Amino acid sequence: MKELYKGFAHVAINTADMAESIAFYEKIGGEVTARSTAGEKQLALVAFGGLVLELIQPPAGELVPSGTGSIPHFAVYVDDLEKAAAAIKEAGVHTFTTPEKRVLPDTFGGLQNWFFTGPSGEQIELLQMF
């Protein structure tokens, strides 16, 4: 099954203040490579060599979602989202947090993803870019 994965994509971090977070990560050597929105959420990708952080700021007035902590998920790239999800289900994982893949044509240039839950409650994102 490991041949399905192309590599590490990113670690997501919730933030209450996008500008403050971007300033902090730029100050320590990060580079903002993309900014986007998902509904009313603000999103930014900050690169450090091979590591990418996805900063997520909830809509104005909303708190960071309860139970997700400051690191809500990590993501891995796949070439074929349907094939990867089928292989994971075949391996006995049935804790997908989204009932089907999500297609987001306007987020970071276009992507589709599917989330499932690991044994300790961690959220894992399968990510295919357009």
Predicted ranges, named:
Residues M1-L4, R35, K89-F130:
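Vicinal oxygen chelate
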Residues Y5, I13-L53:
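Core segments of cupin and vicinal oxygen chelate
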Residues D17-M18, V78-E82:
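Helix N-cap motif at beta-to-alpha junctions
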